[in-house]
């Protein structure tokens, strides 16, 4: 209907800016990664710019998620090293999505049951924050077990962005996402003052 269409066209995703980033964001120095005989990469070198949006593109199984896991210190490179700047605060949106109680509502999960949530040093009305991810009044009361793939992605985005990172690691954030949410996410990233690294297979 017309109301829904207008609401979707106006959809905005608000990405809170985390603490100010210094000059050193994330650097890879001669990084290699292999599992047994299977080499994912060798001699990987890069330096992320403080206000960049960087895409990591490649088919499944080429080590894109492994790269994020190494940046976060969850996995060790086979050789070489990563340097993460002292001002970096990571926020990670992953493919697997951490487990969420299917019986809780969207609002309960994102707000933690509080009327106000802290974004950095400012308080924000929890319902208004949830609404910024295209969950209207009725949608906020939906049980998480009943969400579509796109809605689940928006829920995880809202949770991760609440952490107020200044470096966003987005692992396939566009899977199952509708075109309006995708456009809103792209606009949100353009207005984001930090650095974003987006994994995609296309």
What are these regions (language model features)?
Residues 3-27:
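ABC-family P-loop ATPase nucleotide-binding domain
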């Amino acid at each position: 209907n017309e109301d829904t269409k207008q609401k979707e066209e106006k959809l905005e995703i608000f990405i809170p800016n985390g603490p100010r980033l210094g000059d050193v964001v994330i650097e890879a120095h001669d990084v290699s990664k292999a599992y047994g005989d299977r080499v994912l990469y060798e001699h990987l070198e890069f330096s992320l710019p403080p206000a960049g949006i960087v895409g990591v593109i490649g088919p499944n199984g080429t080590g894109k998620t492994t790269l994020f896991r190494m940046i976060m210190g969850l996995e060790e490179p086979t050789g070489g090293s990563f340097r993460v700047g002292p001002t970096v605060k990571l926020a990670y949106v992953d493919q697997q999505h951490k487990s969420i109680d299917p019986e809780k509502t969207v609002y309960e999960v994102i707000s933690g049951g509080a009327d106000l949530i802290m974004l950095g040093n400012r308080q924000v009305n929890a319902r208004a924050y949830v609404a910024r991810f295209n969950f209207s009044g009725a949608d906020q009361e939906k049980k998480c077990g009943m969400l579509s793939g796109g809605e689940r992605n928006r829920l995880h985005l809202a949770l991760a962005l609440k952490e107020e990172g200044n470096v966003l690691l987005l692992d396939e954030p566009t899977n199952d996402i509708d075109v309006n949410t995708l456009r809103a996410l792209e606009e949100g990233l353009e207005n984001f003052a930090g650095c974003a690294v987006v994994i995609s297979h296309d």
